[in-house]
Every structure is written in structure tokens, then in C-alpha cells.
Amino acid sequence: MKNSLSIAVVFTILLFGLLFIPLAGEVENTFVFFLGRFHPIILHLPIGALIVLFLMEIINDFRPDLNLNSACNILLWFSVISIIPTIILGFLLASSGNYNDELLNTHKWLGWFTALICIWLVVLRQKKSSNKPNSVTRFYKMFLLVNVSLLLFAGHYGGS
């Protein structure tokens, strides 16, 4: 629990640091643009992992005898580990300034909040009791639903 909290704090600070990357073509660095072009390639990793996690949590509610907790933990950690470079590359790609400002801004904030919630889901998941439902379990499930919803909207605006 303590390790996941420390990691969540570090990743949250990293996310806040990304907000200082200038957008709208203020950075003129070909290497930055090159790296940013990998955003559309790797973004499918956290998307797939979060959606599969969401489905596995639903299955786990209806069939606790399957005991999918370990698999859910692995998927959630994989989501966090893959969402961080996805967000970084997205900010680098956005810095090229070749995008509709309104769509880019909406996509940026939806993606940023998706990453932030994903990071803190790890803490909630480790704190919740797998044996009996409690308030942390309800918060975890509610935030997972919110996260998947944000993910769907972020993907919609990013693909536009």
C-alpha cells in the first residue's frame, strides 16, 4: 500500500509537470515531433488494458469464485505504466501546433484526467477489501466507471 501511494504521488507530480509543456507550436524541435508521433501507436495499450480491466471487474462481481483479483491488479498496473508514456507523447505531439485548438484542449484534459484517475485507482484497489464490500470498494468501482467513460470521450475527441 505504501509503495503504491508513493508511486501515485510521483506520477501525479509528473502529470502536473506536463501541464507546463508549451502547446500550439511554441516548441520547434524535430526530435520532439518525432517522439510525439508515437502517441497514436502506444495509446492502444492503456485503452485495451483499462477496458479489459473494467470487464474483468464486472465478471469478478458476478463470479467471485473465478478469483480474478491478481489479473485485475496486473492489468491496472500495466495501464498505469503504459498511460504515462502515452500522455507524455501526447503532449509532445500536441506541441507541434497542427491541430484544432478546441478539440486538442478537450482531448488533452480528458486524457490528463483519465491518466490521473488511473494512477489513483491503484491506491484504491490495493486499499479495498477483496473479501467484503466497503466504501473503498464502491469508490474504486465508481472511479473505474468514470475513468472508462473519460477514456471513451478522450478517444472520441482524439480521433476527430
Regions found by a protein language model. Name each.
Residues 1-160:
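Polytopic transmembrane helical bundles with strong interfacial aromatic enrichment
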